[in-house]
Regions:
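Solvent-exposed loop/turn segments connecting transmembrane beta-strands
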Residues: 24-36, 57-66, 96-104, 127-139
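Intrinsic low-complexity/disordered segments
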Residues: 9-12, 70
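Gram-negative (and chloroplast) outer-membrane scaffold detector with strong preference
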Residues: 38-119
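Residue-level detector of the transmembrane beta-barrel scaffold of outer-membrane proteins
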Residues: 20-22, 50-54, 85-89, 124-128, ...
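Bacterial N-terminal signal peptides
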Residues: 1-8
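Short, surface-exposed connector motifs at secondary-structure boundaries
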Residues: 16, 117-125
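Outer-membrane beta-barrel "beta-signal"
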Residues: 68-70, 108-110, 134-153
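Short glycine/proline- and aromatic-enriched beta-strand/turn motifs that initiate or cap beta-hairpins
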Residues: 12-63, 74, 144-153
């Protein structure tokens, strides 16, 4: 019992966490379709979860527009340094357009990313398909920062 209590903090300390930045393009196909660029920040607080915030600026119905989306995501293979990783998420989105009232939406996302366990590289792409006030499609690149112990594995 005493050994289990001593090992519990060590096991938790080795849990894979990460901080991520992303940049890409997004479009939402809806009655007033949106197209623009997006920047994202995400934190993986534990093994297979990620909390992601994306902010996009562009146009909708020929007017300046912005979108914000926050999702909690489940990563199927978060430590994979090769291949692709699948993830799914649920959250909320807000869309605003000049001279129009803003609107909030439920956000559902399904994504595919290259090597979710690799920190950096030109191959760290992602693509997403989801629903958030219309059909949302996004693609871009991610930079990741992992704990120092991860780079030595």
């Amino acid at each position: 019992m005493a050994a289990a209590l001593c090992l519990a903090p060590a096991a938790h300390a080795q849990q894979l966490t990460a901080t991520e930045l992303s940049a890409g393009a997004a479009t939402v196909l809806a009655r007033r379709s949106f197209i623009g660029g997006e920047l994202g920040f995400a934190r993986r607080p534990s093994g297979q979860s990620r909390v992601a915030l994306t902010v996009a600026g562009g146009t909708a119905a020929n007017r300046p527009a912005a979108r914000v989306q926050m999702t909690w995501q489940f990563l199927v293979s978060p430590a994979a340094r090769r291949g692709t990783g699948l993830y799914a998420g649920l959250g909320a989105a807000y869309a605003a357009r000049r001279a129009s009232p803003g609107a909030g939406f439920l956000a559902v996302v399904l994504g595919l990313e290259a090597a979710p366990g690799r920190a950096r590289g030109p191959q760290n792409w992602y693509v997403e398909l989801g629903l958030a006030g219309g059909v949302r499609v996004a693609a871009g690149w991610r930079l990741r920062w992992f704990p120092s112990w991860w780079s030595t594995r």
